[in-house]
Amino acid sequence: MTPVSLSWIGPCPDSLLEGWAVLRSRMSDDVPMGDLTRTAVPADVEAVRRNERRMIDQGYILVRSLARADRDAVGYTEILLSRHDPEIVHQDDTFVEERMRGRGIGRALKMANLRRLMSLPESDSSRFLQTYTALPNAPMLSLNRAIGFEEADILTVLEGPLG
């Protein structure tokens, strides 16, 4: 079962939408987040479409890749390129289902997405690609370093009760 990578610009194609939504839900549940206590945010098809509209309305170009194995979505990644400030591009989510990890799918997705990004005329003035990775997520930190990301800062996330 060799995964196939599909890349596109903009909203998720209808034929891939259900798989994209399932993976987004799994990511919020499965990715190491240290001691944060926030609960998973379900991402159904409607939530995915709302998020896409919001990002596009804010001026972002969505650069996306999805890995499929036997027609099942097994991984995805997303880059956000701002039409208003294209100098710093944001590498957003990258996620691979646990059963498919360790096969280079995350790397293949990120590289396919970077190629797609570089094909956009809007990326001509882009200088940096920025991402955030939780320190307990050692595999993603390792992948990001392997493809050229360098640590620029450490972000500390604090949470507390309201009220």
Spell out what each predicted region is:
Residues M1-E18, M33-D35:
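Conserved N-terminal entry element of GNAT/NAT acetyltransferase domains
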Residues M1-W8, I147-G163:
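C-terminal "cap" of GNAT-fold acetyltransferases
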Residues L17, A21-R24, N51-E52, K110:
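Hydrophobic alpha-helical core bundles mediating ligand binding, dimerization, or RNAP-core interactions
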Residues S28-I88, D92-E98:
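A conserved beta-strand-loop-helix scaffold within acyl/acetyltransferase catalytic domains
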Residues I88, L117-T133:
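Conserved GNAT acetyl-CoA-binding A-motif
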Residues V96, G102-L117, S142, A146:
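Conserved acetyl-CoA-binding loop-helix of GNAT-fold acetyltransferases
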Residues E97-R101, S126-L141, E159-L162:
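Conserved beta-strand-loop-alpha-helix junction that forms the acyl-donor binding cleft
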Residues R107, S125, T133-D153:
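Conserved active-site alpha-helix within GNAT-family acetyltransferase domains
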